[in-house]
């Protein structure tokens, strides 16, 4: 997607090593490293003059929609309904002020405060986009919900997600995005795999690749047919639950502005002897195809 630095004003006294170009570059790097969910869903770029972007939700066609044709005869047309899903663009802003005195105190040889502003801004905007996307996972917002509030996660719940997605013809790759406690907590996926270390006739997970990966790296990248991800933006709620989700890429989508997802401008405030770094993210998110997602809410403590 396009990343634009907007209209920037950089004076000799306001600039940092490398100028605003370096600040934007650092922000882009931080954004791409920190973002988890956005690469897993659909994305579109809006057009100039429009504040909304539409995604098409196509009805899933079944084998029963395909007829056995007779030679040289017309087949009856099948009605395949579509629904427009709208993402409304809005601004998300973070401002970082760096005073001249603070900048001088930390130096401008690559370790200055201004030189690091881009990374701070990129991380914050990335986290906000993830937070907005995982809000779409909320229990009750989707037709299908495995496990459920107040219920501890079990392997059967993960496979139930797989069953539902396959029954609704959700295309691969399939993603499983969990909160940190859903992954590593006492009632999380890690505990389920670790608890299977002594295999029985019905419990062999601890001695397969998932158990080996967990022991060696502390993480599982593949489990039960899913690519596994975690994000701190899935937070424990007041009922001690976290709301993860199993989904195909077409389940959710987000749109960015015509100039890109992120811009950075600098503005000099001479009377205060500081430089303002303003990062703006422009996006809107929406559920696209409800049947290609399963909310996976579970008790974590």
For each of these PLM feature ranges, what is it?
Residues 138-219:
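Extended, solvent-exposed, turn-rich assembly/linker loops in the middle of proteins
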Residues 250-301:
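C-terminal appended segment following the main domain
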Residues 63-66, 97, 106, 185-189, ...:
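Short helix/loop capping segments that flank catalytic or ligand/cofactor-binding pockets
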Residues 55-58, 81-145, 166-178, 228, ...:
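Long, contiguous amphipathic alpha-helices that act as assembly "spine/axial" helices in icosahedral shell
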Residues 38-40, 159-164, 213-215, 260-264, ...:
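Glycine-rich, charged/polar anion/phosphate-binding loops
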Residues 1-85, 291-293, 298-299:
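N-terminal "assembly arms/tails" that initiate or stabilize quaternary assembly
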Residues 217-266:
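Glycine/small-residue-rich hydrophobic helix-like segments
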Residues 2-15, 19-20, 27, 64-66, ...:
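Signature of extracytoplasmic/envelope-associated structural regions
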